[in-house]
Curated annotation (Swiss-Prot):
It is found in: Secreted. It comes from the Eukaryota. It comes from Phytophthora capsici. InterPro entries: NPP1. This is NLP effector protein Pc109174.
């Protein structure tokens, strides 16, 4: 047996399984397929918008061949990540969890941010939207869970610069009015010097909007509900990915501090952490 071709083949297979790393701006996103199943139709119907103001835009993390993004070094602010030249991507996965239907929508960012500045390579963020039944004509939104980072807050000369988050999700059982796409707040009256009452008008009751933002000035960037509209990205569900892409997302190493939340290894645990009821 000729060992050279055999070794070449083994190396090629290993590369396919583990996923080769390519430039963050060279990853071709998946086009959003026409939804066929009940779960796919519900995910498309409830797909959220992502609004970006203080960080990188979202980028695709893997292509059809299983090649994984290399991300960007956590320096120089948003240099190199203000636009995804080949298009962005939102990843999805759905399942029954206890007695609720859970839809996870996840975004990948090539840099992570703290206190307004880039700090490290790679970030995954996700939202879990909980509904009663995807087979209904108009399922009821029961709650939402938005991921946030639990990393240690940097210190300045032995002084903490903020509070470290303990729970990896912020959770609500009612979406705030301004969390819906198109919603506008109309000021109606003044209660006190800094307090007003509002009416809310013009918004969706299905599509939500989230943003990458800071809970305070000394915090790691996390998902929050947005006050203004963002953009939709092409949605690709876990079972719509190619075998190579799924295998790559199972084995890819994005670092100890951020994990692919919707792969087989992490999905169930993420839903347990996101449970808001």
């Amino acid at each position: 047996m000729n060992l050279v071709p055999a070794l070449v083949l083994l190396l090629a297979l290993a590369q396919t399984v583990l996923g080769a790393t390519i430039g963050h701006d060279k990853v071709q996103p998946f086009a959003q397929p026409d939804p066929v199943t009940v779960s796919e139709k519900a995910a498309v119907k409830y797909k959220p918008q992502l609004q970006i103001s203080d960080s990188c835009v979202s980028f695709p993390a893997v292509n059809a061949a299983g090649e994984i993004t290399g991300g960007l070094k956590g320096t120089k602010g948003t240099d190199g990540c203000t636009e995804a030249p080949l298009g962005s991507q939102v990843y999805g996965r759905s399942t029954w969890y206890q007695d609720k239907w859970a839809m996870m929508f996840a975004w990948y960012f090539p840099k992570n941010f703290w206190g307004g500045g880039a700090k490290s390579r790679h970030l995954w963020a996700n939202m879990v939207l909980w509904i009663d039944n995807p087979a209904l004509e108009t399922p009821k939104i029961l709650g939402a869970s938005l991921s946030r980072q639990t990393l240690e807050v940097p210190k300045a000369v032995f002084l903490s610069m903020g509070e470290q988050q303990k729970d990896p999700y912020s959770k609500v059982t009612a979406i705030p009015p301004m969390g819906f796409v198109g919603m506008q707040a109309i000021q109606t009256s003044r209660i006190s010097r800094f307090r007003y009452t509002y009416n809310y008008t013009g918004g969706s009751d299905i599509s939500t909007r989230v943003s990458q933002g800071y809970p305070d000035n000394s915090a790691w960037i996390s998902l929050t509900f947005a006050g203004t509209d963002g953009e939709y990205q092409d949605l690709i569900m876990w079972n719509q990915l190619t075998d190579q892409a799924r295998a790559a997302l199972e084995s890819a190493d994005f670092g100890e501090d951020t994990k692919v939340p919707f792969n087989d290894k992490n999905f169930e645990a993420a839903l347990a952490q996101a449970w808001p009821f």
